[in-house]
Amino acid sequence: MLGAMFRAGTPMPPNLNSQGGGHYFIDRDGKAFRHILNFLRLGRLDLPRGYGETALLRAEADFYQIRPLLDALRELEASQGTPAPTAALLHADVDVSPRLVHFSARRGPHHYELSSVQVDTFRANLFCTDSECLGALRARFGVASGDRAEGSPHFHLEWAPRPVELPEVEYGRLGLQPLWTGGPGERREVVGTPSFLEEVLRVALEHGFRLDSVFPDPEDLLNSRSLRFVRH
């Protein structure tokens, strides 16, 4: 296994690839794996402050049978205990831009009719100082990559639900796309501001935040367009 490759005196079979020249190729990469390689090189566990993927790192270490790394992870977790949530701020706001879209609808073999429908485009801006919570929000909305630079607390989304009157071909031609949430088997479309902010509220509460302010009407959460959460 991987640990044996870095230990002297461990017999290893020769490379079966005649062009390999006796070198081994490690077919693995990722944020967790870099810490495994650092541990094997340096002989110590050196994780960045606030590292929150020890469970994934432990699973990788167990898969590769790196017992010293497993022991180091156990010592780290025992020394840390249950970490207390750190103070953080989460702000989410949504704007909607309606527009009238005109298109030709086919009503018969040689009969076309000019139709129009309103399409609402939603733009959501999220700001969160807790990177773990921000990552959970991205995962909740199925965003694998986006315009959020590495380490930035900002996250932006834009989507436009398709009205039933608008043909799918016209919807695609306009370059519009829906927004979905939920896991496999329970996916549901985010059709407007209330459903989007409801998902944000769920994630915020799961990460220890509490609702601090509602805009524009503090008494009307369901029809709000901006929410602010804090965690002390």
From Swiss-Prot:
Tissue/organ expression: Higher expression in cerebellum than in whole brain and lower expression in medulloblastoma.
InterPro entries: KCTD11/21_C (IPR045763), SKP1/BTB/POZ_sf (IPR011333), T1-type_BTB (IPR003131)
GO CC entries: cytoplasm
Pathway: Protein modification; protein ubiquitination
Subunit structure: Homopentamer. Interacts with KCTD6 and KCTD21; KCTD11 and KCTD6 or KCTD21 may associate in pentameric assemblies. Component of the BCR(KCTD11) E3 ubiquitin ligase complex, at least composed of CUL3 and KCTD11 and RBX1. Interacts (via BTB domain) with CUL3; initially a 4:4 stoichiometry has been reported, however, electron microscopy revealed pentameric states of the BTB domain.
Role: Plays a role as a marker and a regulator of neuronal differentiation; Up-regulated by a variety of neurogenic signals, such as retinoic acid, epidermal growth factor/EGF and NGFB/nerve growth factor. Induces apoptosis, growth arrest and the expression of cyclin-dependent kinase inhibitor CDKN1B. Plays a role as a tumor repressor and inhibits cell growth and tumorigenicity of medulloblastoma (MDB). Acts as a probable substrate-specific adapter for a BCR (BTB-CUL3-RBX1) E3 ubiquitin-protein ligase complex towards HDAC1.
Record remark: domains: The BTB domain is required for growth-suppressing properties.
UniProt protein name: BTB/POZ domain-containing protein KCTD11
